[in-house]
């Protein structure tokens, strides 16, 4: 039986959020490199610690803004804006 489009979208959103809430330093560094964002291992560790085990929803505007504010505190506003662009690509916005 084929998944309904809405169910399919919810499933994909779940996968993205699950990855966000369990991302590791190496994965963050790889994503940063793929998207041309300078990120040190120490910064990646800090971001991963902020995200790990939380129930953030990247598709929720207030959650996304909360995450970006935490990231801006680690890497600065300019790089947080670059990361926001990646988030928007991931969420299709």
Residue ranges and their predicted role:
Residues 47-56, 68-69:
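Amphipathic alpha-helical segments that form the core helices of the histone-fold
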Residues 61-92:
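Long, compositionally biased
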Residues 1-17:
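Intrinsically disordered, low-complexity linker/tail regions enriched in Pro/Ser/Thr
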Residues 36, 52-59, 75, 79:
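Short alpha-helix boundary/capping elements
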Residues 12-41, 45:
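N-terminal acidic leader/helix
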Residues 13, 41, 54, 58-62:
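Protein-protein interaction and targeting regions used for scaffolding, dimerization, and localization
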Residues 31, 47-50, 86-89:
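Short acidic/histidine-centered micro-motifs embedded in hydrophobic/aromatic stretches
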């Amino acid at each position: 039986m084929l998944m309904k489009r809405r169910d399919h979208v919810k499933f994909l959103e779940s996968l993205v959020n699950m990855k966000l809430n369990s991302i590791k330093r190496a994965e963050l560094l790889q994503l940063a490199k793929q998207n041309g964002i300078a990120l040190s291992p120490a910064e990646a560790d800090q971001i991963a610690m902020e995200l790990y085990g939380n129930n953030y929803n990247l598709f929720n505007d207030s959650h996304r803004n909360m995450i970006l504010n935490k990231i801006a505190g680690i890497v600065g506003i300019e790089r947080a804006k670059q990361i926001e662009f990646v988030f928007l690509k991931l969420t299709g916005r």
